[in-house]
C-alpha cells in the first residue's frame, strides 16, 4: 500500500490542513481511501494503544471513520464494534471495512507524525509512504 502525505490549501493559497491520500496509480483505491482517511483524522493517543500488545479488541475510531483493533490487525471502515458492544439491530452483513496489519498501521502513523513535525518550506512537498518498508 502506498499513501501520499501532503498539505491542503484553498484557492487563495491559505493553508488548511495536512492530508493523507491513496497514491493515484494504486490498484485498490477504495481500501486505501479508508486507511488514508483514518491516518488524516486518527486520535492522538492511538499509537499507545497500538503498541500495547495486550489490547486485542478495542474501538479506536474517529467521527470520520471507525477502526477496531483485532489482535494483530486493525479493521478500518463502518459499523465496527468491540465484542459485546454491538447494537441491538447490528447486522454483520452491513459492516464494510478493510484490514491492515497492526505493524503497518503503526508504521504509517509514525511516518505521519514525522511528516507533521517537519516545517512547511514548500507548499507542494509530498511524501509517498510504502507500507512494505514496515517490514525492512
Swiss-Prot record:
It holds the Pfam family DUF5376. It comes from the Bacteria. InterPro entries: DUF5376. Belongs to the UPF0275 family. This is UPF0275 protein PM0493. It comes from Pasteurella multocida (strain Pm70).
